[in-house]
């Protein structure tokens, strides 16, 4: 009996630092919920620029279809990766102790013409929204994944309806 083969990753998650690992966990959990294979790397745009360049230049050839890049402070990682790959890059600005993540957000969102980085929120919603955006990109041409996204959004709406009912009619 042969061992079960792990599917090749479609999404690459790249952290600028391992200190971002806890913050990015909801992203990985959401990708898992959608059954999207992914890989996780720690590569710094500033401390390991050669590795960042190699990762970006080989990502499409290795079968990745989307890159999620999380970085804080002088958060250049998403932009560096976007400048070197034809794949869509989603930037996740990490919260920082000095400016609360505003520095990260502005570093990621202010890209020059021709080098887009899709940017999500700082804080808890950012990693989850990055995974959902990656899923929506991948769902183009994948009806089963598209249906999983539709059902996810139905569950979100149901939770809001329950919360509304609870506040309108308290026990």
Residue ranges, per PLM feature:
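Basic/polar N-terminal segments that are highly enriched at the extreme N-terminus
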Residues: 1-8, 171
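Short glycine/serine/threonine-rich phosphate/pyrophosphate-binding segments
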Residues: 20-24, 48-52, 71-80, 99-102, ...
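N-terminal beta-loop-helix "entrance" segment that forms/cooperates
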Residues: 40-61
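Short, glycine-/small-residue-rich phosphate/pyrophosphate-handling segment
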Residues: 97-147
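Glycine-rich phosphate/pyrophosphate-binding loop and the adjoining helix
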Residues: 138-171
């Amino acid at each position: 009996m042969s061992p079960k083969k792990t599917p090749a990753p479609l999404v690459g998650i790249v952290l600028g630092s391992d200190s971002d690992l806890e913050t990015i966990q909801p992203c990985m959990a959401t990708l898992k919920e959608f059954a999207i294979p992914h890989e996780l790397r720690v590569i710094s745009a500033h401390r390991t620029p050669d590795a960042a360049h190699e990762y970006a230049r080989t990502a499409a050839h290795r079968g990745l279809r989307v890159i999620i890049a999380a970085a804080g402070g002088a958060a250049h990682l998403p932009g560096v990766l976007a400048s070197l790959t034809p794949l869509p890059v989603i930037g996740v600005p990490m919260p920082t102790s000095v400016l609360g993540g505003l520095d990260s957000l502005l570093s990621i969102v202010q890209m020059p013409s021709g080098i887009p980085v899709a940017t999500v929120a700082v804080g808890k919603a950012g990693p989850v929204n990055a995974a959902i955006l990656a899923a929506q990109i991948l769902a183009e041409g994948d009806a089963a994944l598209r249906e999983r996204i539709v059902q996810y959004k139905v569950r979100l709406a149901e939770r809001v309806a329950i919360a509304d009912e609870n506040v309108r009619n308290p026990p």
